[in-house]
From Swiss-Prot:
InterPro entries: DYW_dom (IPR032867), E_motif (IPR046848), Pentatricopeptide_rpt (IPR002885), PPR_At4g14850-like_plant (IPR046960), TPR-like_helical_dom_sf (IPR011990). This is Pentatricopeptide repeat-containing protein At1g56690, mitochondrial. Pfam families: DYW_deaminase, E_motif, PPR, PPR_2. It comes from Arabidopsis thaliana. The keyword Coiled coil does not apply. The gene is PCMP-H69. Residues 1-12 form a transit peptide.
């Protein structure tokens, strides 16, 4: 009877101990370590399992100091207790402490050794892991797998292969890992040999082999293997689909996608990205719209597709929809939207994205800083761009180039030169891109002497050989300064063949300074280089029109029709209340506020006439009467956008207008005068640069 009571008590204590250990572990797993400790302290009888559980709980909750204190208080320890201490330190990335405990252990088993090997592998200390592995008194299947898997993860495929061949038991997990490692190294045929030799394969093995073929651009072989796969899962279907999308075979991908029995989010995302890369925006949007569930990558892929194709308005629209649905934009999404904001000059959205980046602490990255600076520069907010630049004590070359390019596009040559001369003292030497930016700045600001000095010292001072882009900037600089003959001499002295940008710069100078003789030479060279470029025809027509050579204008226009060359349509846009309004020449018929815009145009036209404005009809090349030409000029897209800005934006707020082409001379003169008669600041970004109009003056000083 006494013996029976003893057995029952031991059974009770053991079962109670197991239950207590379970409760401590449960509380620890859900982060309630303090409750676990209270429960532990309340135990009248603390079994060794309970001690091990609470020590492990402290480690799991990132409290190694408290775990060690409890371990030291244990009156009795077994090998499980010591293993728990080693594993706990390893979980907390404290490999030195783990090794010290390992050396102090009164006894070790295969779990102790394997834990240390795994710990060293986790820390990237492969040499120590190998040394310990080969010292192990005995190894089990887990030991081999840990060492083998660590070598594969570290990219040591040759060593992994040798170890694989030595393994006493090659289970399906080990073989699958070996196949994956070999495929990542491009050794796909070697991987296939292992695959074919396997007696047992699971769905992961098949998918790994298919993925290996896909990663090595052998999509057709992957498809053959996929077709004979005994059991296909969502992952295997998706892997095969990715093979088509990542290799650019979007038609095959589309066909495969249609027959997929399940269409997981990752597969739909792949199709959106694939369609986006080949410009099939409507198909990408159809996939997007049909999705029941979307993740961050879905929105990012669709926004990127719009951005890549130049559908900036749709990208902004989608970003707004994303916010309404409470989806937090990812870093790549924010960068894509910043690029869109820069293109559209959408300052309000740009500021909003900047705030997102600050909240997510992404704004301390120099790459992000460069993108932000570009956005602010293109929105006409140069002061904000400079503030971003000044935040960084250590700047990379891209940041320097961004701010110099920004000053250049705004015609602020002095500021650009100041920044340029600060570069060497900061430890950053100008590169090819920097020199293009500073030469452009000198050209736009009329800094001929400084610009020529930089150009002539490029090789000796900065070790940069002039490229065709540098020559183009210098030709433009000379041409803007009226030194058209010297510009031609520079072209003739070039050691590299001048391209269309060089001849285009000369042709632009010929227009500004009425050099019809050299204009014909430049135009001929441009027609040879870019026979389909409508800009050359238009510029030559404009030069002839300015000299009233209407017969020559007609010849140029006829040649355009003969060669099927059409002029790229001009458009301008303005952001009002987080909405971008787009205008084309004369194109306000579909605008909901058409009548009010026309009234504002009539009002400004009247003010201009009173101020003595005389339209320059040479900028209208159509064969129509003078009255129609005058009316056509006032309907240029930039004039429509300015009128809308006057109509909608309150006084004191700058009117920011963007245009995809170079502003014509008449619109430039008209907007200058509009800024005076309306007492409004107008900022116009055209294809070449920024124009800041204020009180009848322009920042370009009519030098553009």
């Amino acid at each position: 009877m006494k013996r029976l009571k003893l057995i029952l008590r031991r059974t009770y204590l053991t079962s109670t101990g197991v239950n207590c250990s379970f409760e401590i572990s449960r509380l620890s797993r859900i982060g309630k370590i303090n409750e676990a400790r209270k429960f532990f302290d309340s135990l009248q009888f603390k079994a060794i399992g309970s001690w091990n559980s609470i020590v492990s709980g402290y480690f799991s909750n990132g409290l190694p100091k408290e775990a060690r204190q409890l371990f030291d208080e244990m009156s009795e320890r077994n090998v499980v207790s010591w293993n728990g201490l080693v594993s706990g330190y390893i979980k907390n990335r404290m490999i030195v402490e783990a090794r010290n405990v390992f050396e102090l252990m009164p006894e070790r088993n295969v779990v102790s050794w394997t834990a240390m090997v795994k710990g060293y592998m986790q820390e990237g200390m492969v040499g120590e892991a190998e040394s310990l592995f080969w010292r192990m008194p005995e190894r089990n299947e887990v030991s081999w797998t840990v060492m083998f898997g660590g070598l594969i993860d570290d990219g040591r495929i040759d060593k992994a292969r040798k170890l694989y061949d030595m393994m006493p038991v090659k289970d399906v997990v080990a073989s699958t890992n070996m196949i994956g490692g070999l495929c990542r190294e491009g050794r796909v045929d070697e991987a296939r040999l292992i695959f074919d030799e396997m007696r047992e394969r699971n769905v992961v093995t098949w998918t790994t082999m298919i993925t290996g073929y896909r990663q090595n651009n052998r999509v057709d072989v992957a498809r053959k293997l996929f077709e004979v796969m005994p059991e296909k899962t969502e992952v295997s279907w998706t892997s095969m689909l990715l093979g088509y999308t990542l290799s650019g075979r979007i038609e095959d991908a589309e066909e495969f996608f249609e027959v997929m029995p399940m269409k997981p989010v990752i597969a739909c995302n792949a199709m959106i990205v694939g369609f986006g890369e080949v410009g099939e925006i409507s198909k990408a949007r159809r996939v997007f719209d049909l999705m029941e569930d979307r993740d961050n990558a879905t929105w990012r892929g669709m926004i990127k597709a719009y951005e890549r194709k130049g559908f900036e308005l749709e990208a902004l629209d989608l970003f707004a929809q994303m916010q309404k649905q409470g989806v937090r934009p990812s870093f790549p999404s924010l960068i894509s939207i910043l690029s869109v904001c820069a293109t559209l000059a959408s300052l309000q959205y740009g500021r909003q994205v900047h705030a997102h980046l600050v909240r997510c602490q992404f704004d301390d990255d120099v790459y992000v800083a460069s993108v932000l600076m570009t956005m602010y520069v293109k929105c006409g907010e140069l002061v904000k761009a400079k503030l971003v630049f000044d935040r960084f004590s250590s700047k990379d070359i891209i940041m320097w180039n961004s701010i110099i390019s920004g000053y250049a596009s705004h015609g602020l040559g002095e500021e650009a030169l100041k920044i340029f001369h600060e570069m060497p003292s900061s430890g950053t030497m100008p590169n090819k891109v920097t020199l293009i930016a500073i030469l452009t700045a000198c050209s736009y600001a009329g800094k001929l002497e400084e610009g020529l000095e930089i150009f002539e010292s490029m090789e000796s001072k900065f070790c940069v050989t002039p490229t065709v882009e540098h020559y183009s900037c210098t030709v433009d600089m000379l041409g803007r300064a009226g030194q058209v003959d010297k510009a031609m001499e520079l072209i003739e002295s070039m050691t590299i063949k001048p391209d269309a940008t060089v001849w285009g710069a000369l042709l632009g100078a010929c227009k500004t300074h009425s050099r019809l003789d050299l204009a014909e030479v430049a135009a001929k060279k441009l027609f040879e280089n870019e026979p389909d470029n409508a800009g050359t025809y238009v510029l030559l027509s404009s030069i002839n029109a300015s000299r009233s050579k209407w017969g020559d204008v007609a010849v140029v226009r006829k040649n355009m029709r003969t060669n099927n060359v059409s002029k790229f349509p001009g458009c301008s846009w303005i952001e009002v209340g987080k909405k971008v309004h787009m205008f084309t020449r004369g194109g306000i018929k579909n605008h909901p506020e058409q009548a009010m815009i026309l009234m504002m145009l009539e009002k400004t036209d009247g003010l201009l006439r009173e101020a003595g404005y005389s339209p320059d009809c040479s900028h209208v090349l159509h064969d129509v009467d003078e009255e129609e030409k005058v009316d056509s000029l006032s309907r240029h897209s930039e004039r429509l956008a300015v009128a809308y800005g006057l109509l909608k934006l309150p006084e004191g707020v700058p009117i920011r207008v963007m245009k995809n082409l170079r502003v014509c001379g008449d619109c430039h003169a008209a907007i200058k005068l509009i800024s005076k008669v309306t007492e409004r600041e107008i900022i116009l970004r055209d294809a070449n640069r920024f124009h800041h109009f204020n009180n009848g003056e322009c920042s370009c000083r009519d030098y553009w």
